Structures are given as C-alpha cells and as structure tokens.
C-alpha cells in the first residue's frame, strides 16, 4: 500500500469520491477518514468531469437501493435524485481543495487512453483516468480496487 504523500496532487477515482460524498454508502466513514488524512497532508485533490459523471451514477444507484422496494417506481432517472447529485457536485466545485481537470492536449490524451487499454488491459473509463494523470503528471491516485497497482508509473493509495 502506498503511503499518503504530502503537498502532492492526487487523482481521485470514483470508487473513493462517491463514498466520500454519499453518507448512505457503506464505505462513507472510511472515505471520510482517508479524506481527512489527505487534507492534513496539504494535498491537492484532482478529478475529471468523467469522475463526476460516474459519481452521479453511483449516487442514483445507492439512493435507489435505499428505497423500499415496494415504493420503487420503474424507470427512475437521475432527475429523481437531483438534490443529492447537486449537493455532491456543489461540495466539489465550492471546495478549493479540489481541482477539476481536462486534458492539456486533448488529442494526445485520447491517444494515450487507447494506449493504456492496450498496455494495461484497462476498461476505457479507467484508461481515461490514467490518461488524465499522465497528461497532468500526477503520480498518485486513490482508487478502491487494485487495477492501478499493476501500473508502475501510478501509485495507488488504496481505499
């Protein structure tokens, strides 16, 4: 397991950000504790719009799972959870510890994502997360699974 760095940029994967933002999530307490440690270390937390997209989907899934199955309407959409989604996004965009990033070089970033699929057998979304890190020269990621452990240039702070 990678030690938590100090004064570094750390890319946040959805597997960490969603539990941090969503109290009903089973890993909420664990995420809160790790976030405190990241901030105590004066780290800058980086994410992409892709992470926010994935987080919105997790919010819908978790909130939907909290409902009584008898009251569950078929076809519920993201709008039914808009207050939870808005609260999560506002938490990120209003906090100066977070930085939402895009590619510095979009063409190179997209090409690198394809290379990451080929080189590391990643799913496209994970390949893009790694590509954002490469584009921004970010060495650390907080991810809830071990897929990033196999990547030599990426230091996974396990969650």
Model-predicted regions and their roles:
Residues 38-40, 73-75, 128-131, 151:
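Short, surface-exposed, polar/charged, turn-prone segments marking secondary-structure boundaries
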Residues 5, 94-140:
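Active-site neighborhoods of divalent-metal-dependent phosphate/nucleic-acid chemistry enzymes
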Residues 1-51, 58-74, 136:
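Short, well-structured N-terminal submotif of metal-dependent ribonuclease cores
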Residues 12-13, 47, 122-124, 145-146, ...:
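Histidine- and aromatic-rich ligand-binding microenvironments
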């Amino acid at each position: 397991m990678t030690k938590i760095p100090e004064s570094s940029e750390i890319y946040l994967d959805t597997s960490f950000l969603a539990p941090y933002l969503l109290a009903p999530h089973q890993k909420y307490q664990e995420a809160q504790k790790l976030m405190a440690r990241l901030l105590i270390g004066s780290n800058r937390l980086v994410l992409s719009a892709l992470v926010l997209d994935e987080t919105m989907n997790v919010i819908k899934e978790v909130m939907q799972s909290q409902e009584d199955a008898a009251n569950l309407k078929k076809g519920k959409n993201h709008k039914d959870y808009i207050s939870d989604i808005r609260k999560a996004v506002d938490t990120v965009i209003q906090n100066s510890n977070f930085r939402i990033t895009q590619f510095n070089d979009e063409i190179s970033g997209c090409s690198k994502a394809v290379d990451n699929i080929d080189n590391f057998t990643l799913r496209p979304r994970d390949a893009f997360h790694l590509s954002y890190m490469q584009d921004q020269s970010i060495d650390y990621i907080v991810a809830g699974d071990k897929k990033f452990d196999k990547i030599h240039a990426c230091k996974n702070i396990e969650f």
